[in-house]
Amino acid sequence: MNKKNIVLFDMDGTLTPPRKDFDKELFVPLRQLARHADIGIVTGSDYDYLNSQMKMLIKYSELRFVTHLLPCNGTKHYRPPSNSDDEYTLIHETNMQQHLGKQCFKELMSILCTSQSEMCYNSFPLTGHFISYRGSMINWCPVGRNATHEEREKFKKVDESYSTPLRLRELDKLRHRVNLKCNNQVVVKLGGETSFDIFPLGWDKTYALSHFKDRRCWFVGDRCGPNGNDKEIFDSLSKEGRGFCTSGTVDTYQIITKITQDLINDKL
């Protein structure tokens, strides 16, 4: 295992097309990168979604031995196996309900239920699994996490049909409601293409950096702009030239190649 460097990647829109499986074309640059650095996958999704989308890499590839899994913004940390007989080991996790207290958590859930009922008047499809509590964060998906690709596309079309996108309007409203009840101790961000992430202040993706204080960290993600869930960690590492914003898996390929070359040059 490389102790000096680790490159952290967002998942959806970075290593995979949104809500789809790992792009196998990235095996080539990632294998080259792994000679010089460990790999981390930091995502707002929970472990089950990460495992499902990244199965080709973390179950059936030798890269599993150098790849850290950091679901829920890195508030959970799964250490890579040391040999072919081992599995990933959960070595750190946090609990949002305990951190905020039962009353604040209950208020949050009530706000999200109200917001979901209000969103039902729009013309996008409704499926199921609208609110997902992941231990250290809450994900609210108005179209439902059970939505098919086609249903997600319909939601995006409705979202973007307004002069101010529907999710951005809802984001402002939701932040106002949450701050009134939780004294500005809770953050609400856009999550991926269709949802919202809700978590305690400070539990954004910069949390993942706390697991690697003895290493140089890089980050590659696609949601690095205002309201995006990659913004904080991107901004933090960009100050040192180690934050990269990608437009998709093809761009990620080029970024990995650049980081690898920089690491090689650094050793010369």
Where are these regions (language model features)?
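Conserved acidic, metal-coordinating active-site core of Asp-based
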Residues: 123-218
